[in-house]
């Protein structure tokens, strides 16, 4: 628990130094592993943005994946997954927006609109779109139109799933487009 408190203090200090006018919070919660996803989802629902590290890789456990999925699918709020090296700025100029035509993806895209509007470019990334479905001829096209109507500069990238995890494909694409 002491390590968690130290991490909380360090995160609060880092956030305060990055954007002094930003109103934010970092919370420590003690819970059973089985209830962790419910706690994360409940906190995420009343947040404007959830910031998490990549759930896979060295030093990551099964709880990291569960936390990310709870925030993404149950939290109904935008989730910013920070790459291992961190972010160069608190206001990114290029945003990669994962799109799979799901309700959760649409809710997250709508709620992320303030962030998307401030970006210079939003890359809508569709990985292995379905061969049959309403967007089969133009995957991500309808979302792109929605974003453009809101003043967002957006384009669609359709990628093949060439790595075991979708998150790895997204992370690689984010690095590729800087």
Protein language model regions, located:
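Acidic, proline/glycine-rich short linear motifs
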Residues: 1-5, 122-149, 176
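Soluble or luminal CAZymes and related metallo-dependent hydrolases
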Residues: 3-7, 32, 63, 104, ...
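A short, flexible beta-alpha/helix-coil linker loop
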Residues: 31-34, 56-58, 128-131
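Conserved N-terminal ligand/cofactor-binding loop architecture of enzyme catalytic domains
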Residues: 1-17
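A general structural motif
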Residues: 101-113, 134-140, 163-167
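Structural beta-alpha unit
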Residues: 13-50, 149-178
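Intrinsically disordered or low-complexity boundary/linker segments at protein termini
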Residues: 23, 27, 40-126
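Charged helix-capping and loop-helix junction motifs
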Residues: 64-67, 137-141, 171-173
């Amino acid at each position: 628990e002491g390590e968690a408190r130290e991490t909380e203090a360090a995160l609060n200090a880092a956030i305060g130094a990055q954007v002094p006018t930003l109103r934010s919070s970092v919370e420590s919660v003690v819970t059973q592993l089985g209830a962790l996803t419910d706690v994360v989802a409940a906190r995420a629902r009343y947040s404007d943005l959830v910031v998490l590290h990549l759930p896979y890789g060295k030093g990551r456990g099964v709880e990291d994946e569960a936390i990310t999925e709870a925030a993404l699918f149950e939290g109904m709020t935008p989730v910013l997954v920070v790459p291992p090296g961190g972010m160069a700025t608190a206001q990114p100029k290029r945003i990669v927006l994962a799109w799979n035509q799901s309700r959760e993806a649409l809710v997250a895209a709508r709620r992320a609109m303030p962030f998307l509007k401030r970006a210079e470019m939003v890359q809508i990334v569709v990985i292995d779109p379905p061969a049959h479905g309403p967007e089969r001829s133009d995957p991500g096209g309808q979302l792109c139109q929605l974003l453009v109507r809101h003043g967002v500069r957006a384009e669609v990238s359709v990628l093949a799933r060439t790595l075991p995890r979708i998150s790895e494909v997204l992370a690689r694409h984010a690095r590729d487009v800087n």
